[in-house]
């Protein structure tokens, strides 16, 4: 197993074809690659008690959630996980929430989605390649702001 510091945590909720991102302020957190046969990860987030009801609902309903996590340094690209809440524990004025799930190959999905959209817009051949490069550069510029 490998353990990393959790720097930032966002909940991603589907909104049409995209995701809405909501930041959850961390007090502290860890992320563990279990390196098991199912490639599962455990995420532990230590949070202010104002968020406890939401995570208790997720646990009770056994809902899958999509989380975006920055690991080790805030300058790292975020990793996307499909998880379920394992447990929620009150700790004084705070609580911890334990998630278990798998990392999602988000970049591959984004590339496929962008290519599909370009083809639907009528691009093909060399024009498709050029427009794809332009949009990738544009997306990277928007994400670096």
Segments predicted by a language model, with ranges:
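Compact, well-ordered interaction domains used in eukaryotic information-processing assemblies
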Residues: 32-83
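N-terminal "first-domain core" detector
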Residues: 1-43
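Short peripheral tails and domain-boundary helices/loops at the edges of structured domains
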Residues: 84-108
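Mixed-charge, glycine-accented linear interaction segment located at domain edges/termini
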Residues: 103-145
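Short secondary-structure transition/capping segments
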Residues: 6, 10-17, 45, 112-125
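Charged, low-complexity, helix/coiled-coil-prone segments
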Residues: 1-8, 24-27, 54-58, 62, ...
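Intrinsically disordered, low-complexity acidic/polar segments
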Residues: 52-54, 76, 92, 106-110
């Amino acid at each position: 197993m490998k353990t990393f510091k959790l720097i930032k945590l966002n909940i991603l909720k589907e909104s049409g074809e995209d995701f809405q991102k909501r930041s959850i302020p961390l007090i502290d957190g860890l992320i563990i690659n279990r390196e098991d046969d199912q490639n599962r990860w455990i995420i532990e987030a230590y949070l202010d008690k104002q968020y406890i009801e939401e995570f208790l609902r997720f646990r009770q309903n056994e809902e899958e959630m999509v989380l975006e996590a920055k690991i080790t340094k805030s300058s790292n690209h975020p990793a996307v996980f499909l998880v379920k809440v394992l447990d929620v524990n009150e700790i004084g004025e705070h609580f911890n929430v334990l998630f278990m799930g798998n990392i999602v190959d988000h970049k591959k999905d984004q590339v496929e989605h962008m290519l599909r959209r370009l083809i639907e817009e009528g691009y093909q051949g060399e024009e498709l390649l050029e427009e794809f490069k332009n949009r990738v550069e544009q997306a990277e510029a928007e994400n670096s702001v």
